[in-house]
């Protein structure tokens, strides 16, 4: 399985789901490899990259949250889109997954057709950011590398942004000093949501503010425009390498 934009690695301890998705996604033109344990998932990604990961939350040896965290902590894997699956109806599970950097979340039972649509949407978004990338954008005390998804502060701190966090910051940088409503933010950062739109957008903005050290009662960089949405109150410019 090669990371050619059409390869998927799935981990789920339900054999019927694995077989169903292997068949369905293969017919849609994807190369699919599936495993039943977290340890096997880690080994598979160490051996060969994938274009997208599908993680079941509940596994025999560990949970999908730890796998999501592990992916986002590795430079080689940090930008890979992640979809999480869960049989739980607990909203807290979904919030945790998204906060850890998952790009989308789907509850069981689910429609393979809907999963396929979400996979295609995430891969299109990943490809789009790669095509448009190449520049380093500077704003305030920060620089964003739009290819590697790395965010740098002038004090030397740097870290990787998950797909959702990167998409949100890139949206603000593409529209500086413009009010963006919640619909615009939701549509740009991920497709259909498993949580109420207002909740998911506010949570995503809050997470990005923490990354940018823009916390407190009156955030200065990403400002809330009451009744309208959010605004990036900063000048954005290309960063010229010395």
From Swiss-Prot:
Organism listed in the record: Pseudomonas aeruginosa (strain ATCC 15692 / DSM 22644 / CIP 104116 / JCM 14847 / LMG 12228 / 1C / PRS 101 / PAO1)
Regulation: Phosphorylation of GltR induces its dissociation from DNA leading to transcriptional activation.
One of the protein's GO biological processes: positive regulation of D-glucose transmembrane transport
Molecular functions per Gene Ontology: phosphorelay response regulator activity; transcription cis-regulatory region binding
DNA-binding region: 134-234
Protein name from the UniProt record: Transcriptional regulatory protein GltR
A Pfam family recorded for this sequence: Response_reg
Occurrences of domain Response regulatory (ranges): 7-123
Record has Lipid metabolism as a keyword: no
Keywords from the named record: Cytoplasm, DNA-binding, Phosphoprotein, Repressor, Transcription, Transcription regulation, Two-component regulatory system
GO terms for cellular component: cytosol; protein-DNA complex
Subcellular location: Cytoplasm
InterPro entries: CheY-like_superfamily (IPR011006), OmpR/PhoB-type_DNA-bd (IPR001867), Sig_transdc_resp-reg_C-effctor (IPR016032), Sig_transdc_resp-reg_receiver (IPR001789), WalR-like (IPR039420), WH-like_DNA-bd_sf (IPR036388)
The protein's role, per its UniProt record: Member of the two-component regulatory system GtrS/GltR involved in the regulation of glucose metabolism and transport, as well as regulation of the exotoxin A gene expression. GltR controls the transcription of genes involved in glucose metabolism (glk and edd/gap-1) and transport (oprB) as well as the expression of toxA that encodes exotoxin A, the primary virulence factor. Acts as a repressor that is released from its target operators upon phosphorylation. Contributes to modulation of the type III secretion system (T3SS) in response to host cells via the regulation of the OprB transport system.
Post-translational modification: Phosphorylated by GtrS.
Main location as per UniProt: cytoplasm
Residue numbers carrying 4-aspartylphosphate: 56
Gene null: resulting phenotype: Disruption of the gene causes loss of glucose transport activity. Inactivation results in elevated ingestion and reduced cytotoxicity of eukaryotic cells during P.aeruginosa infection.
